[in-house]
Structures are given as structure tokens and as C-alpha cells.
């Protein structure tokens, strides 16, 4: 039986816009989402890495692990004293667990990417019998940004689970609620300090939707196109990484896990339009963008967003329209204080997209939109890498996509939308997630926040940020006010900066991966 609320919020198969995928032919009655799951939000990289370690360390010969990632550092510790992700996966492959991975091939480390790190992780695992591919089957200037772990147990499908979210297997992600940063840092904007405080999130999911998530992995694995351009240099790189020239077919899948809980989950993806096209998405897929459009079209009370970017008027347009349509709607957005790279050349294109998006929202509804950033108790800004969106405490998303045109049209992305199908008075998952992150950001108990309506909530956020601003303005006299939040102010651009930053932003930083017929429209 299909839950009515899920049917209202989720995309129908025809709304996904990708008839090339099998994923919508595997679900419940309407075929576009799966009910009967148990979803547990995991806030902070340290929380996620601990759960990942606990599940992986319990596997035995015959079990299976499938993962995708944007960046992987083999020496990243899952726990404070280890082991590392490379050691854990190496031990699994050597003990008879099937390990398959799809890592983005990436670009040179000299360009602040991670080709060397991804190659090292892939090489190490391939040497011990795993099969990890360096995958560059993306459109020009695109990337594989999906972050997924599927863990399967031979003969025990009820124990199967998946992890989906925004947390890579790499340095800088293992931070906790104190936000003092990962002891294994990575190069970053100097204003975040030597160990960047890092806010992130993922989902732990059990139930039949694990099958849909595995099918997403399988579609990419079974793509028969070359993994990279056929150049002598790329062929040498693949040889050095011990990548198989012809990846082995995936084994017959275990049965999908049985129902595990009251949560309906819809798997959303982005794949850019490219030539040759993906066999499973010939015209690309933009179900991430379409899902947000639908949810914003329903929103009446509160849209809460945590995001790394909030770029582009195209992406902000859906929230803008919701604000104009619903006079009671409030919008609260949390973003990083500074771009991750904010040099003389790298900073202006990043700020260009955010300035446009924020201006569009604030002009639509003065006084009903709040944009904030975070800092730890030492005053160091916290880099917001979480990708969370909660609408009316009913529908929420967590995954790899950011609020920018690149994530909604160009790069490969993987996000889960979730609706709690428990009886109306007991739908709590989205609300509990919101209260969990608000409690941390505002420095207040969940109980004190639970009764706030959206206008009062936005007022509280504004007053909390103002109190901290006033404390700094007064020379930090007395006790520091509670909370992490500051009013966010994007550094403006000069006319000259805007002149050259705009083409760089549109072509490189935030490219449009839609088919040409859609690019002059607001459609996805």
C-alpha cells in the first residue's frame, strides 16, 4: 500500500525524466520510491566513519561491499587511533569479501584535485583482489561526485544496509560536534585555520531501498563505454593503478532486503548530458533538481537548507517562487563563511554565483529569508559541507548534491529524499533531524526549540546571530553568547571582478549540463 503523503511529495516515474533507467521499475505501487525502510541521519564525519567501521569490520567471507566516491585517501583514519579506510578495505578483500569500487579519476593535484590520492587507493585495493575503477565517464569539466556504500551479507539480507551522503573517504572529513577539525587536514582557505572545522552529514539506510541504491552502482559499473580517454598517458595511469582492462561482470545480486521501518525513500540522481550518452541515462538525469522543484512547489511553512554553495539564480528560482506564492513561508539557509578556495582568481567566481542567488531570495521576501554561517567556540569558521534540505518538517533530502547548477545538471550525484510514513501525528523523522542540527547551531536544547513556529524560529536565528555579532563588536567582553551562527555576508565584487568572474563561473565553476534544448529555459 502506498502512503498518501509520500505520493504527494515524491516524483512519479514520468516526472524523473529518464526512461532509460530501471530504477523506477523496481519500487512500490507507483514504482518511483520504496517504502518500508529505516533511515538514521548521521551528523558529523566522525559519527559516519565510526558506523562505517562497525559495519565493515563485521563482514565475513562471501559478503559484498560496493562503494563510489569523489575522493579517497587510503590513510584516512575511521577512528581516532585507526584503522584507516585503506587498511579496512584491504583486509576485507584479502579475507574473501567481494569489494568493488568506482572512484572518480579526478584531475591533477596541482589543480587542487585528487588524482594521485584516488589512484593510490585504487592501486592498493586492486593489488589484493578488490576491483576498483578510476571512472572518468563524465561530460567535459564534470566529475563523479556520488558518495555511496552498499554493504550486503550473504544469506542475511535483513542485515544489509547502505550509507549515502556528502562525506568522502578522505582527509578533513572526520570532525565531530566540537568542530576542532580532522587531525588529518587537507589544504584549505587559510581563514579556516590549520585544521578546518567541518560540518557534514550522511544517512544510514536499511530496507528494500538498498536494492535501488545498489542498482545505481550497477548501472555505472555495467556502462560499456571506456572509463577514460584512450590516450597513451591515460593507459599508463590505468596500468599503474592495476585497473582491469575489462572489468568483471557483477555477480548475481542477493535478494533485496526485507522491510525494516516506516520510512519511504526515493533515490535521486544527476547525470550530465554527454556524448556518448550513459546507457541508463541517454539524455542525462536531473531528478535531484526536479525533486526540489516539486517540494518547493508544495512548501508552505519552512524551507531549511544546509549547503556548501547556494549558487545560481536557476537553482534559487524554485525557492523564490515558493516565497512569492506562500506569504507565511520562511527560509533559513546555512552556508560556509568563505569559499574553500578564495584567492584573487578563485574567489570571485565562487562569490558571483552566491551573490546572485541570495539577492534573488532576499528581494522576493524581505524579512522572511535568513542566510547564516557557522563558527566554533574558538571563533574559527566552520566549513559547511552538509547537503541537507528539510521542507515543512515532512520531506527531507541528504546526499551528495549541492545547491548549484553543476550539481543539478552536470556532475553525477546521488541523494535520498525521505518521508516518514508513520501515522500523521507521529511523523517525526524530518522534524527530529531539524531539531538535532538546530540544537547544535543555536546552543539550545531540542525541547526549547520544539514548539517554535517558523516566524519565531527565523526570529530566534536572527537574534542569536545578532548577539554574537554584538559580542564581537563590543570587544568580546563577558561570556561568549551561545550558538555557532553568524549572519552571512558574501563579500561583494567590484565591477571589474564581476566582468571576468562571470564567464569563469558559468563555464568552469558552475557549468550547465542540460541538453541544449533546455539551456535557455528554467526547466530541468
Give the residues covered by each predicted segment.
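Charged, low-complexity intrinsically disordered terminal segments
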Residues: 1-524
Amino acid at each position: 500500500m502506498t502512503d498518501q503523503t509520500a505520493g504527494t511529495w515524491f516524483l512519479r516515474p514520468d516526472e524523473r525524466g529518464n526512461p532509460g533507467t530501471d530504477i523506477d521499475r523496481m519500487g512500490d505501487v507507483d514504482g518511483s520510491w520504496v517504502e518500508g525502510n529505516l533511515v538514521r541521519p548521521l551528523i558529523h564525519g566522525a559519527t559516519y566513519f565510526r558506523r562505517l567501521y562497525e559495519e565493515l569490520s563485521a563482514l565475513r567471507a562471501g559478503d559484498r561491499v560496493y562503494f563510489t566516491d569523489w575522493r579517497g585517501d587510503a590513510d584516512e583514519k575511521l577512528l581516532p587511533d585507526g584503522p584507516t579506510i585503506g587498511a579496512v578495505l584491504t583486509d576485507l578483500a584479502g579475507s574473501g569479501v567481494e569489494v568493488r569500487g568506482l572512484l572518480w579519476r579526478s584531475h591533477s593535484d596541482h589543480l587542487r584535485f585528487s588524482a594521485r590520492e584516488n589512484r593510490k587507493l585504487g592501486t592498493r585495493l586492486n593489488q589484493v583482489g578488490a576491483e576498483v575503477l578510476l571512472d572518468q565517464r563524465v561530460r567535459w569539466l564534470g566529475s563523479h561526485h556520488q558518495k555511496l556504500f552498499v554493504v550486503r551479507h550473504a544469506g542475511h539480507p535483513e542485515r544489509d544496509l547502505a550509507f549515502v551522503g556528502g562525506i568522502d573517504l578522505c582527509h578533513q572529513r572526520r570532525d565531530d560536534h566540537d568542530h576542532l577539525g580532522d587531525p588529518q587536514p587537507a589544504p584549505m582557505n587559510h581563514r579556516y585555520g590549520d585544521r578546518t572545522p567541518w560540518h557534514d552529514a550522511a544517512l544510514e539506510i536499511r530496507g528494500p531501498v538498498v536494492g535501488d541504491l545498489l542498482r545505481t552502482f550497477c548501472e555505472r559499473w555495467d556502462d560499456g563505454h571506456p572509463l577514460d580517454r584512450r590516450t597513451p598517458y591515460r593507459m599508463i595511469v590505468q596500468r599503474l593503478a592495476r585497473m582491469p582492462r575489462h572489468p568483471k561482470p557483477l555477480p548475481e545480486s542477493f535478494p533485496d532486503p526485507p522491510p525494516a521501518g516506516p520510512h519511504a525513500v526515493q533515490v535521486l540522481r544527476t547525470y550530465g548530458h554527454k556524448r556518448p550518452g550513459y546507457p541508463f541515462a541517454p539524455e542525462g538525469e536531473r531528478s535531484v533538481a526536479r525533486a526540489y522543484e516539486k517540494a518547493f512547489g508544495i512548501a508552505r511553512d519552512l524551507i531549511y537548507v544546509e549547503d556548501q554553495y547556494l549558487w545560481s539564480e536557476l537553482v534559487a528560482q524554485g525557492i523564490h517562487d515558493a516565497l512569492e506564492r506562500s506569504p507565511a513561508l520562511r527560509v533559513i539557509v546555512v552556508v560556509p563563511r568563505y569559499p574553500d578556495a578564495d584567492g584573487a582568481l578563485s574567489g570571485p567566481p565562487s562569490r558571483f554565483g552566491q551573490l546572485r542567488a541570495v539577492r534573488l531570495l532576499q528581494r522576493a521576501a524581505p524579512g522572511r529569508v535568513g542566510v547564516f554561517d557557522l563558527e566554533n567556540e574558538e571563533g574559527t569558521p566552520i566549513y559547511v559541507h552538509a547537503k541537507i534540505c528539510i521542507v515543512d518538517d515532512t520531506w527531507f533530502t541528504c546526499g551528495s548534491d549541492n545547491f548549484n547548477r553543476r550539481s543539478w545538471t552536470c556532475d553525477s550525484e546521488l541523494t535520498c529524499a525521505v518521508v516518514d510514513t508513520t501515522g500523521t501525528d507521529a511523523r517525526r523523522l524530518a522534524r527530529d533531524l531539524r531539531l538535532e542540527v538546530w540544537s547544535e547551531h543555536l546552543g539550545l536544547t531540542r525541547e526549547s526549540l520544539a514548539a517554535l513556529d517558523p516566524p519565531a524560529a527565523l526570529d530566534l536565528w536572527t537574534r542569536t546571530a545578532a548577539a554574537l555579532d554584538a559580542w564581537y563588536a563590543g570587544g568580546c567582553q563577558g561570556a561568549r553568547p551561545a550558538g555557532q551562527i553568524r549572519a552571512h555576508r558574501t563579500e561583494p565584487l567590484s565591477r571589474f571582478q564581476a566582468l571576468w568572474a562571470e564567464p569563469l563561473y558559468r563555464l568552469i565553476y558552475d557549468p550547465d549540463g542540460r541538453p541544449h534544448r533546455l539551456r535557455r529555459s528554467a526547466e530541468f
